[in-house]
Amino acid sequence: MKIAAFDIGGTALKMGVMARDGRLLETARQSINDSDGDRILQAMLSWLAAHPSCEGIAISAPGYIDPHSGLITMGGAIRRFDNFAMKSWLETRTGLPVSVENDANCVLLAERWQGKAAEMANFLVLTIGTGIGGAIFCQHQLINGARFRAGEFGYMLTDRPGGRDPRRYSMNENCTLRVLRHRYAQHIGAPLDSVTGELIFDRYDAGDPVCQRLVAEFFNGLGHGLYNLVHIFDPQTIFIGGGVVERPGFLTLLRQHLAWFGIADYLDTVSHGNDAGLIGAVYHFNQLYRSPDDDRH
């Protein structure tokens, strides 16, 4: 059985054709401007039309998501997905079974299914992207929360609020590549689109003093949040995900900056890089549509 898998991000849509055992058979990526939800939906339908052999749809998406009904009550940066019944919408248009799960939860499920957490009972995932995402695995169970909001680590404060809006002092506003890029672009007077995370870390490695300061602030904010998570959940490991972790030497750099917090040994990176969301989405599909006589999934 082939599954069409989609990993929806704030700036890109990753698409795949996957076997039910998690093997990736084909992938593609499409840039998404301005978190355009309608464009995302059309791209998904086009991918499905081009791959008629797929018999199911597995989706990793941002926001607060009921993993059973597929209702997205808040779509993160994609406002089109607020209060959107994505599962029903796609099933009506395709006639295929559909599963929808939060993106960070999918990264966690991939790590548990086919990664370094296969034998772990307690671990966390923290993803660094347009925002900070998170997922919790406690006593052999994925924790969704009463309103499907568990793991929203990005709302943790990294400093004492000094203004009216505490969100300005959250991890989302201080520990993401989006914020890092924005701050460096402002400093050098360049358009945001011309400044990438890769550029900043390259200049950090080259000794650029501004990049050295900004990257240190970035890791310091992460350190505050990760320190709190270690002492709240007592995890075996916190796995860090997101495109930035694929940079050579990132884990070593992360551990160096966070050594002061005394938590470096708790940290690792996810096993599947940018494919983690697709793999975890298929795992969730398997769980939702598990047949009684099929224990492989």
Swiss-Prot record:
Regulation: Is inhibited by N-ethylmaleimide in vitro, but ATP affords considerable protection against the inhibitor.
Effect caused by changing residue 9 to A: Loss of catalytic activity
Reactions the enzyme catalyzes: D-cellobiose + ATP = 6-phospho-beta-D-glucosyl-(1->4)-D-glucose + ADP + H(+)
Organism superkingdom: Bacteria
GO molecular function: ATP binding; beta-glucoside kinase activity
Induction, per UniProt: Highly induced by cellobiose. To a lesser extent, is also induced by gentiobiose, cellobiitol, and methyl-beta-glucoside, but not by arbutin, salicin, esculin or phenyl-beta-glucoside.
Keywords: ATP-binding, Carbohydrate metabolism, Kinase, Nucleotide-binding, Transferase
Pfam families in alphabetical order: ROK (PF00480)
CDD domains: ASKHA_NBD_ROK_FnNanK-like
Catalytic activity, EC: 2.7.1.85
Outcome following mutation: residue 103 to G: Loss of catalytic activity
Binding site for ATP: 5-11
Disulfide bonds: none
Subunit (UniProt): Homotetramer.
Xref: NCBIfam families: bglucokin_BglK
Role description: Catalyzes the ATP-dependent phosphorylation of a wide variety of beta-D-glucosides, to produce 6-phospho-beta-D-glucosides including cellobiose-6'-P, gentiobiose-6'-P, cellobiitol-6-P, salicin-6-P, and arbutin-6-P. Is not able to phosphorylate alpha-D-glucosides. May have a dual role of kinase and transcriptional regulator of the cellobiose-PTS operon.
PANTHER family: BETA-GLUCOSIDE KINASE (PTHR18964:SF165), ROK (REPRESSOR, ORF, KINASE) FAMILY (PTHR18964)
Similarity field: Belongs to the ROK (NagC/XylR) family.
Descriptive protein name: Beta-glucoside kinase
Record organism: Klebsiella pneumoniae
Source organism phylogeny: Bacteria, Pseudomonadati, Pseudomonadota, Gammaproteobacteria, Enterobacterales
